[in-house]
Amino acid sequence: MDDVIIVDLEGRLVMGVGDELLRDVMNEIVAEGWKKIVLNLRDVNIMDSSGIGEVLSSWKLAQRFGGAVKLLRPAPSVKRTLRLTQLLPLLEVFDDENAAVKSFA
């Protein structure tokens, strides 16, 4: 699907490191008109409360403009953090890129 953008994130999604980058990228993507957004978390090895906050803010931003954010391949430690914060029922998580993209149909 040509109307889905996949954002590859890597490293640490923590306060002062990846959280601000994610915010900037999401603002740019939404300003460009993208509404179907997949955040690829495969290479994110650490996510703290700031990172979780930015993922949630990304989800809210997309929804505000009629879009959606879905998560792809979170590492086990990141998935555990999402589960502990009870965000997994709210956010759709996929292990397969094609499934994530097709879920927007």
Which residues does each PLM region occupy?
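Amphipathic alpha-helical interaction surfaces in cytosolic regulatory modules
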Residues: 13-91
